[in-house]
Structures are given as structure tokens and as C-alpha cells.
Amino acid sequence: MSKPPDLLLRLLRGAPRQRVCTLFIIGFKFTFFVSIMIYWHVVGEPKEKGQLYNLPAEIPCPTLTPPTPPSHGPTPGNIFFLETSDRTNPNFLFMCSVESAARTHPESHVLVLMKGLPGGNASLPRHLGISLLSCFPNVQMLPLDLRELFRDTPLADWYAAVQGRWEPYLLPVLSDASRIALMWKFGGIYLDTDFIVLKNLRNLTNVLGTQSRYVLNGAFLAFERRHEFMALCMRDFVDHYNGWIWGHQGPQLLTRVFKKWCSIRSLAESRACRGVTTLPPEAFYPIPWQDWKKYFEDINPEELPRLLSATYAVHVWNKKSQGTRFEATSRALLAQLHARYCPTTHEAMKMYL
């Protein structure tokens, strides 16, 4: 039978008060560890899983209007979506995100990179979401090879090292790393899969969004290929890595780097410098995460254009809102956004929810 570590035995043999403190610390650490495991078991599993059962594997494609070639403006770049888990069954919000981007950017390639997709010439999984998104001629579903993505970047050694250890927020941290690597290597536009795109984003270059007066957010990024700002983000990711603090490698990283980039101490001091611009919250985060329930409240349809006149895309805060049910035909804000900006997904929701 193995013996307890000597240090632990010495601590337990100490004075009663010391023993109480020791046991309290051990109990706290154990409780903290278990809490994290339970949290990720609950949050990490999609709460809408029940909505995806008994759905058909395929859906008839709608009649789509051929895109009108752009007459002016910058050369269109790629639009990227990422799925860094092994899931290959997009939920309805995921479908709406990609569809809305495809409809507002008919001239661009919309690339959905999914870690769970097989490589080579393997066929795509049979699933309603895959079938629906494949209807759009400018959407491509591609396998995500993280090792290849991080190759020849400062993130390569970090990724190799993190493979051998457990961290509480590894999945979102992988997503944080992947998006800045994508922007560095390829440029274009990155969007989280809980956005609904309202307008064409082609005129936004070297831009990111402000979440609040104190922090930026990387759920939307638009950068030129090999921009130095993204290079600094990758270096900061490795140099100041802490996978145990939520957001440290994502929003907080972008905020840190932007402050260094502009030599400022507060975001209020500058919205743009050295060719990088931050847009105000209403551009991409018109409803703060604390008020996410507003997406499920009824709204007068006539008010929608006025409320979102300064908004390019709406972030729905899926981490908070996932699993919240709503009627697809209701006057809820989210239902109206689906109906207007991702009508094919909306029709599927009306049929199968």
C-alpha cells in the first residue's frame, strides 16, 4: 500500500489549528477541481442536443438568387468559421451564422473549418446542418488540422506542449489560438459561430470590436495577411500564457496587445492607431452579455432597423444563451433575426423544432 507524501504527514501531525487549516486547503482545492469538471461537463455539452435528435440527414436546397459580382470595393477575402471540438453536427445558431455570412458576402469564400471532419477524399457526415450549409455555393466545409495551422508560428511549440496536459479551458483557448493564427497566415475575416451577420463586412480591414469600455473581443476579426498586430498577438499568447484564467488568452490578450500597440493605458484613450481600428460595442456587440435574455424578448418588427442601424453583425452570446428555447415564428428578437438574415435555417427551424 502506498504511503502518503511525507510533507502531508508532517502537516497532519501538526497542531490542531494547523491541521484544520491544512484540511481546509486540501478540501478547497479538491472542491475547486470537481467544480471545474462539473462546469465543463454542463457547459461543454451542447444544451440544444435534444433539438438535433430525429432530424433528417438531408434537406432540399432552396432556390438561390445568383450573386451579383461586386462593381467596386476591395478584393474580397475569405470568411472563416471554426469548430475546434470534434463536433460535426452544427446547431441552428451555427447554421444561421454561416448562412447569414454567405448571403451577405456572395462574392467571398465562406470556409467552415471543423476539427472533427475527416481529411482526404472522405465524404462529409450526413447531418441536417452539413446538408443545409452545402446548399450555398460559396460555403466550403473543410477539415481543421491544428498542427498544420500552427506550423511555422510561435504557437507550434505551445500546441505540442499542451497536448500532454489537462487544462480547464483548453477548448476555448484552442479557438483563441486558431483564430489569430488564421488571420496571420491567411488574412480575411473571422467570425464566431454565434454571430448573425447583417451587413457586408468587405470594407473592414485591420479591425476588431469593442465589447465594453474595458475590453476588446476577438469573436470578430478582420485583418490583412501577416499583419504585425496578429504577430504580436501570437507572441503574447505564448509569452504570457495562462490557461487557468477565463478569457486571458482571448479578449484580455487582444486588449493587452492593443494597449501596447497604441502605447495607451485605457481603451478610452484611442480607438485607432498605427493602422488598427476598434469599433464601438454597437458594431458587433449591441447587447452586452449581461443582457443576453433580451434576444428572447418580443420586439416590434418596425423597430428592428432602427435598433440595429449601426450594427454589422449581432453576437448572441451562445455561452449564456445556449439551450434557451424560443418559437421560430414568434416576435422574439432572435426569431426575427433568423427570419430576416438566415431564412433557409429559419424554415428548417419552423419545420423541425
UniProtKB/Swiss-Prot annotation:
One of its GO terms (molecular function) is toxic substance binding. Ubiquitous. Highly expressed in kidney, heart, spleen, liver, testis and placenta. A motif (DXD motif) lies at residues 192-194. The keyword Glycosyltransferase applies. It is found in: Golgi apparatus membrane. Pathway: Glycolipid biosynthesis. GO terms for cellular component: Golgi membrane; membrane. Its EC number is 2.4.1.228. The keyword Lipid metabolism applies. It comes from the Eukaryota. It is an enzyme of class 2 (transferase). The chain crosses the membrane at residues 23-43. Residues 44-353 are lumenal. Changing residue 187 to D: In p individuals; partial loss of activity. Catalyzes the transfer of galactose from UDP-alpha-D-galactose to lactosylceramide/beta-D-galactosyl-(1->4)-beta-D-glucosyl-(1<->1)-ceramide(d18:1(4E)) to produce globotriaosylceramide/globoside Gb3Cer (d18:1(4E)). Also able to transfer galactose to galactosylceramide/beta-D-Gal-(1<->1')-Cer. Globoside Gb3Cer is a glycosphingolipid of the globo serie, one of the major types of neutral root structures of glycosphingolipids, that constitute a significant portion of mammalian cell membranes. This is Lactosylceramide 4-alpha-galactosyltransferase. It comes from Homo sapiens (Human). The gene is A4GALT.
